[in-house]
């Protein structure tokens, strides 16, 4: 009797357990079917938890806004575009993503599953960026080279200018030294002449008259005298000899002419009268005829030499 009761209780418990299991399974079936149907319409990337490209673009824009500096107070922020319609397709979002590609910061993490076209576009932009950097580098290198060449050229010009300056300075110093020596020699000569002149002028009147008579007789005897030799003979300066001859010509003591070779040619009064008589007799006389006749009318032989020839 007790065994039958125990079997009946066990059977009842088993039926209750099976019933509860079936009820639980029946309630869980309607929730599973809509979830399965929803997954059939969702792309695989969404099911795998990969964000959509529009979401990637929005995330990139958000990062750009966070990294971008705040706009100045006077600058007006660009107006936002009209809100997108709820029914816009993914193609519109993809176009917006393409427009924002230029603002993608360097080194931004990109989706590994982006399309081949977008990847090619990004690679082209990267290539252009590298090309621009290379051009800038080449330009900087060229500027550095040109600056170096300009500095070398300027240094060479400075060296040449310094050499030229030293050469001119050396020539100037040499000229000054030469002029200084000439001036010193001139002063020494002037001092010597001054001493000789003072000694001559401090003599008594008789000695001066004697020297003047000797001076006049020397010129008359030699007929043609070199002024420098005459100055040495009487211990005078050349200019003093010239001045004294001109004074003697002015008072009629001496007659003659000083040529351009530094010589004085003495012509006596008789010889001048003979030349004047010849010109008066001929009327018109050419220079050649006058020179030829003067050689015959004017005797330029020194008296001492003429006396020796006559005695011999």
From Swiss-Prot:
Residues 59-162 are annotated as: Disordered. Its main location: endoplasmic reticulum. It holds the Pfam family DDRGK. Residues 24-312 are cytoplasmic. GO terms for cellular component: endoplasmic reticulum membrane. It is a single-pass membrane protein. Belongs to the DDRGK1 family. PANTHER family: DDRGK DOMAIN-CONTAINING PROTEIN 1. Substrate adapter for ufmylation, the covalent attachment of the ubiquitin-like modifier UFM1 to substrate proteins. Required for ufmylation of Atg9; protects the nervous system during aging, possibly by stabilizing Atg9 and supporting its function. This is DDRGK domain-containing protein 1. It comes from Drosophila yakuba. The lineage of its organism: Eukaryota, Metazoa, Ecdysozoa, Arthropoda, Hexapoda.
